């Protein structure tokens, strides 16, 4: 899998989120997928930290922070990294109960190294927990909004065959 870089900007939206531990990847010949996903997860974590830093002003975290990261990584990866972050910091009272509950619903495999340390700890966002909580709330809202808005192409693909045939028939009939 090739990751394309364009003048410092990296688009990793098309790299699938690999949700299994390194051992599973090794056993199934999927190490390349695991490594590409892990690289994208790390870059996403860093992009979230940067976006929070750039878009937190006057005690407000602006929605552009999420849009900036989503453009590069997509919502699935952002939410995966945020779920890992909240799970790793479950003891932290600055995360809302709602976000903690949500994080428990996201499938994340424990990924132990040779010393018994969960490799997921390296993917935890290192910004202020209160700001990460706000970012998570905004990211979840943004992901829901994008779920509800299918693209025009998506609507055409999901259109029943009868409706598509009727639309074609109407365009071919001459107007009277």
What are the functions of these language-model segments?
Residues 1-175:
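Gram-negative host-targeted secretion-system effectors, predominantly Type III and Type IV
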């Amino acid at each position: 899998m090739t990751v394309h870089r364009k003048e410092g900007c990296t688009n990793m939206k098309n790299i699938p989120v690999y949700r299994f531990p390194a051992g599973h990847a090794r056993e199934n010949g999927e190490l390349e997928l695991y490594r590409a996903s892990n690289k994208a997860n790390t870059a996403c974590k860093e992009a979230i930290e940067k976006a929070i830093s750039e878009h937190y002003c006057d005690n407000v975290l602006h929605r552009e922070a999420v849009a900036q990261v989503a453009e590069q990584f997509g919502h699935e990866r952002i939410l995966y990294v945020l779920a890992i972050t909240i799970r790793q910091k479950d003891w932290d009272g600055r995360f809302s109960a709602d976000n903690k509950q949500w994080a428990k619903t996201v499938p994340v495999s424990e990924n132990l190294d040779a010393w018994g340390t969960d490799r997921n700890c390296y993917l935890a966002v290192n910004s202020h927990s209160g700001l990460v909580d706000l970012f998570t709330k905004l990211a979840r809202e943004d992901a829901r909004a994008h779920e509800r808005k299918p693209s025009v192409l998506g609507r055409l693909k999901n259109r029943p065959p009868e409706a598509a045939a009727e639309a074609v028939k109407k365009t071919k009939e001459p107007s009277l």
